Amino acid sequence: MKDIKTIFKGFHRPLGLPAFLCPTGRLRKNEGKMLTKLVTFTDNCTYEIKKEKQGDWNKLFGVCFGILGIHRHSIRFGWRWNISKQKIEICYIIYDGKRIERTQIAFCDCELNREYHFNITWILKDDRTLDVTFHPLQYDVEEHLNVPIKARRFFGCGFYFGGKTRAPHRITAKLQQISKVI
């Protein structure tokens, strides 16, 4: 089933073609774009790794701008397992041109085996600035940001575990495309 994403032990992402190799669209001024997914984190999304890495963010989904934008110019939801809360924490991640995470603050929690809607909308305000909204639909939380970009062509960013740390065991989540206006 294509909605089920599995990252095998020792890997960063599900097998198959990386999402960033599949161009999804081009930005035009004042034209809105939207990506909404229904996400279910399964029991095996829990993990315990080295203490200094446990707080690192994994990637859920989003978009990057430009062919090499995956680590330089992207907007996406992030996730991590919080051992003390026994819940998945969700944040938004924005990379600037220096691959520095400017904002990584958990703004909602998810229980395992429940469905959650996540929505990202963006609109090109001027030649190089996006107005971005991150909205987990079950929560009364919405983040609006202005994000600088350097390219108008954008690509998908998919389910991913870690940075340098690889999946400690099989990690599975359901990411169902609900709407895609791009």
Q: Could you describe each region identified by the protein language model?
A:
Residues 5-89:
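Secretory/extracellular carbohydrate-interaction modules
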Residues 30, 109-113, 125, 166:
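Surface-exposed coil/turn segments at beta-strand junctions on protein surfaces, enriched
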Residues 37, 171-181:
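Extracellular beta-strand elements of beta-rich domains used
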Residues 37, 114-124, 130-132:
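Short tryptophan-centered beta-strand motifs in secreted/extracellular beta-sheet-rich domains
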Residues 92-117:
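Short, aromatic/His-centered strand-loop micro-motif at the edge of beta-sheets
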Residues 100-103, 138-144:
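Surface-exposed loop/edge segments in extracytoplasmic proteins
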Residues 142-174:
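Flexible glycan-contacting loops in extracellular carbohydrate-active proteins
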